[in-house]
Curated annotation (Swiss-Prot):
Gene Ontology CC annotation, any one: nucleus
Name of protein: Protein PAT1 homolog 2
Record function comment: RNA-binding protein that acts as a translational repressor.
Family assignment from sequence similarity: Belongs to the PAT1 family.
Gene Ontology biological process terms from the UniProt entry: deadenylation-dependent decapping of nuclear-transcribed mRNA; negative regulation of translation
GO MF: RNA binding
Domain of life of the source: Eukaryota
Lineage of the organism: Eukaryota, Metazoa, Chordata, Craniata, Vertebrata
InterPro entries: Pat1-like, PAT1_dom
Bilayer-spanning residue ranges: none
Composition skew (Basic and acidic residues), residue ranges: 49-59, 67-93
Record key words, sorted: Cytoplasm, Nucleus, RNA-binding
Length: 735
């Protein structure tokens, strides 16, 4: 792995976002790290004191107080002496042994220090050989210095450790192993097998915090030495120390305490010393930090010898506690964070990491379907469509919901359950109403009308509403329609109760029929009174409540379902009102064409009329319209409901005349009937066949009616227009 090459890693972006947070924690972490450096360094040195005392008696060379850094360009010759009794497998095992075993081996072997004479046996030690080969490679180090990648050079760290009197025997398999020793280790078959298959080990939970007395780390006499001022420029403060679990082997421990070097204002500067400063960005290895870690591939493990080298004998050392240590994981080319440092990072970065992780875990499948410009265009058009001049008409359900919500909040405020606050309301952009509206022009070659995104009235542009009337009339009509709809809903609730009583009457005993019938009649009478079917003139048709009810499709259905429950007199009044204002109803029904729902109930009412009542109803169609010379018959021939109602009236009259039942007519009824039949035949002969519509039902006795009063030529002409089915030969009745 070439550490000198510049690599752009994804962690650089996370570090740029977290730079401010790292700067704030710099001062706090420095004191913790320096104290941990002193504690761990003194602890390891205190274990090596007996070894160094024995070496002082055996070796005449003394340790200099201020050792200078040896220049890498002048290395001394190295003699590689291999001992036959020291197998490579044993070297790997020594790396993972515990602290006590390491100290015993150091005492038994006589120890190895930097101050001793370089004999053949000492040159075989990789820790001793490291002193002759200059600076180490960054991938061979496993410390917080490689982690952070920020700050000083390796020379500062070497100076601090040399002044503290740390000898090479203190750290067996130190990261300062030379590259020649690395080549020697590469010849080891056991290590090569580990490099080929790096075992996956779960992450280690290294949260061991405690006091020095609890962990057995006692301060040594070296605390009073003057060299302490060189190592720690800040005063001594009682802090928690970084402790390592006694179960963790030496190969998993950092070679020296967690000590990130001092850093300048910039996080990464190009002026750092090449070859001595890590080019790897800050990579925290804590599971609480949301920075992805790189897996330990065999290619990366190849450079990790020394304290971080994987040992094939890792499992035998920890087989008794397999379940508890399944969480351990050998770190990569960087070390674990300080426990207290990791806790601070996790506390400060938890909201940011959770929000980022929440968004990353739910990718938008439609993210790339529309560009940002297209999204803004759609949003703008939708917001324009929300602007309505008649909110109660165009957005009735939202307005009703908002009014209900306001009433609920008012009740809660009245009871003291909630503080007074404004409810959340849909905010729509304010659009100035245009003085004049121009219809969208149809462009040749386009489908339908042109879609104009800047149109102030989208509903008008697509002909969703009529814009022929003035705005004031549209506004008044909207509120009037809303009032009619509310009135219809109230009457419908009463009608549902009447229909429920009618269904129950078929399942109750006969002695209770009278009670239910009385109750039903009472409710029907109440509905009839609410409808307020008072006669009116043509000028007041738009103000009549009953006619307004018939202008709504739901109102027509209400009357059609109510007619069977009304009495004969009440139903006759409704029939008369419908026939009197038939032109008005036909004109307002051009959009919905829902008048046909009234044909069936009205037909049953017509079949129950007497001859005198029939003449009174049919004569309403022969009276001329106000301010016009046309008759209602002319409009009736052009409307399906009108022509069907006219044919039904004529058919019922012919049925009464041809029956044997006494009609008990009034004086002049026959003359009125004859005049009406002649007038209908005259208008029917003048109307073009193309303008006539097909009726809902064509009675079969209409030609028999006309044969009583018309000649043969006129009958054939009417037959062709009505397209009646063929009937047996008939005889014309002379007039």
């Amino acid at each position: 792995m070439d550490l000198g090459s510049d690599q752009l890693l994804p962690e650089d972006y996370f570090l740029a976002e977290e730079g401010a947070l790292l700067e704030e924690m710099a001062e706090e972490d420095e004191e913790i790290d320096l104290y941990n450096e002193v504690t761990f360094g003194l602890d390891q040195e205190s274990d090596e004191e007996p070894t160094k005392q024995e070496e002082d008696h055996k070796k005449p060379v003394q340790i200099p107080e201020a050792p200078k850094i040896e220049e890498p360009e002048k290395p001394q010759p190295i003699k590689e002496t291999k001992k036959p009794e020291k197998s490579p497998l044993r070297e790997v095992k020594i790396v993972v042994e515990s602290d006590e075993e390491h100290v015993d081996r150091s005492i038994d072997s006589g120890g190895h220090t930097m101050n001793s004479t370089m004999d053949d046996s000492e040159l075989g030690d990789p820790a001793v050989m490291r002193a002759f080969h200059g600076k180490p490679t960054l991938e061979s180090l496993d410390s917080a210095v490689v982690d952070s990648g920020i700050g000083s050079t390796w020379s500062e760290l070497d100076t601090d450790y040399d002044q503290s009197g740390m000898d090479s025997g203190l750290w067996e398999a130190s990261p300062k192993v030379s590259m020649s020793a690395t080549g020697q280790i590469l010849e080891d078959k056991a290590i090569l097998r580990v490099m080929e298959r790096a075992p996956y080990l779960p992450p280690a939970n290294l949260e061991f915090l405690g006091s020095p007395l609890q962990r057995g780390f006692m301060p040594s006499q070296r605390l009073q030495r003057p060299e302490m001022g060189v190592m720690s420029p800040k005063p001594y403060r009682p802090r928690f120390m970084r402790q390592q679990s006694p179960l963790v082997p030496r190969s998993m421990r950092p070679p020296f305490p967690f000590t990130p070097p001092r850093r300048g204002p910039p996080i990464f500067t190009p002026n750092q010393s090449p070859g001595f400063v890590s080019q790897t960005p800050f990579r925290p290895m804590s599971p609480n930090v949301s920075t992805p870690t790189r897996p330990m591939t065999p290619k990366m493990v190849r450079m990790h010898f020394g304290p971080m080298s994987p040992s094939p004998s890792f499992s035998p050392f920890f087989s008794p506690m397999g379940n508890a240590l399944q969480r351990f994981k050998v770190p990569g080319h960087v070390t674990q964070l300080h426990p207290q440092h990791r806790r601070i990072l996790s506390q400060r970065q938890r909201p940011q990491s959770s929000s980022r992780k929440q968004w990353e875990s739910r990718p938008d499948p439609y993210a790339s379907l529309m560009s940002q410009k297209e999204k803004e265009w759609v949003i703008k058009l939708q917001m324009i469509q929300l602007q309505s001049e008649n909110p109660h008409l165009d957005d009735y359900y939202y307005q009703a919901y908002y009014e209900k919500l306001e009433r609920k909040l008012a009740e809660e405020e009245l009871l003291g359950e909630r503080k007074k606050r404004e409810p959340t309301k849909l905010v729509t952009p304010y659009i100035q109403k245009a003085e004049m509206y121009e219809s969208v022009v149809h462009i040749e070659g386009s489908l339908g009308q042109v879609a104009v995104s800047t149109c102030y009235s989208p509903r008008r542009a697509i002909d969703a509403v009529s814009y022929a009337m003035p705005d004031e009339a549209i506004k008044a009509l909207g509120y009037q329609r809303l009032r009619v709809l509310k009135h219809t809903e109230k009457v419908f609730l009463l009608l549902l109760e009447v229909e429920e009583l009618a269904r129950k009457m078929s399942h109750i005993p006969e002695e209770e029929h009278a009670h239910f019938q009385h109750k039903q009649n009472y409710k029907v009478q109440r509905i009839y009174d609410i409808l307020n079917m008072a006669p009116c003139h043509s000028e007041d048709e738009s103000e009549n409540e009953f006619l307004q009810l018939l202008q709504v499709g739901k109102g027509k259905k209400l009357i059609a379902r109510l007619l069977p429950f009304l009495t004969r007199v009440q139903a006759g009044k409704i029939l008369l009102l419908v026939v009197q204002h038939l032109p008005f109803l036909i004109k307002n029904d051009s959009a919905e064409e829902s008048l046909s729902v009234l044909y069936g109930p009205l037909k049953n009412i017509i079949n129950g009329l007497s001859f005198t009542e029939l003449i009174g109803v049919i004569q309403e169609l022969t009276r001329p319209l106000p301010e016009s010379s046309d008759l209602p018959l002319t409009l009736a021939f052009q409307n399906q409901f009108g022509i069907s109602l006219l044919y039904c009236l004529l058919s019922h009259g012919e049925r009464l005349l041809s029956s044997d039942m006494p009609m008990e007519p009034c004086i002049g009824d026959f003359e009125k009937w004859t005049d009406t039949v002649f007038l209908v035949a005259k208008e029917l002969s003048h109307v073009s066949k193309s303008s006539m519509v097909e009726p809902l039902f064509l009675p079969s006795n209409l030609l028999s009616l006309f044969c009583r009063y018309l000649d043969k030529q006129t009958i054939h002409k009417l037959e062709d227009k009505m397209e009646c089915p063929a009937i047996p030969p008939y005889t014309a009745v002379p007039s």
